[in-house]
């Protein structure tokens, strides 16, 4: 940090107001330096006012007491060795680590004018230096503020020094002109100095509320962040509650719909069950008979088509097939079927020309009750006709042979 020329009033207000704050800021730089560069380092010119103070405020909040002492040290001012009285303020923490020190140096050098006895010509040059020192073990940090105040005659002393240098170079006429002009301007320079001091005091007063505001800003920001987090949490809780309520309402609606649909389903199922009960239930035997009837009808239709193709007359009856029974012959039309199965009630199966309902015609099963013979035209007979009555040859028993003789039952 470059040296800053300030007046005494600025130093006093600065020292009283921001002493601890600047110490804490410098302590931050020390810790960083120890981590980066190791031990035994000396850091000078640390910039102040640009580091977060609140990081280290807690570490230095347990100070017990202050201790002050003075010590004289040599210093070189204008290439002259001068003893300086250094005033230290030391802050001791409970643990004794770290030790914070601040000191201020007062350097007064009096320059007298040898040519005249006028007190206005006496030049007093005053230096004031403040050093903030923080020592942590073997690490030392120094931050300096350099101040210079000019008392009446200080400018003359500076001019005299310039004149002495000029005398060595042989410029005597220039020296006389400078001394005459400086005497006339001393009275005019005092007024601007007072005005500058007043302006600086006003600036210091304006800086105080700004510093307070800067300290309050982080606290306000933290408070606002906490409020924002609380609001976010409340909103999340409300959303969860709303979701739970919606789920409960959906479940209730589903239960109500199921309860309403159950009687409707029962009503829909009842007529279906009644229809199933009303439908007739056929046995496997009846189904087989129904299939055989369908096949017989198909065969009969095929036979009729063949007769039409052969040019047979419509008066001829369909050929019959002779079937040998136990008690006699039964004449079965080709493609037809006789149901010999009887139910418990004595009724037969389904007729070939009608469907399956219970009102199917009943066919007798006795050998005497046979299908009435179909009249066919007489054929020439031979001597063996009498012997062939009631008997059939193996060839006639074949289902493919057609008989043109009338079938007479054995048991009339």
From Swiss-Prot:
Residue ranges, annotated region (Disordered): 150-171, 177-196, 302-412
Biased segments, Low complexity type: 156-168, 335-345, 364-373, 381-394
Residue stretches of biased makeup (Polar residues): 177-187, 310-321, 350-363
Protein name: Uncharacterized protein DDB_G0285291
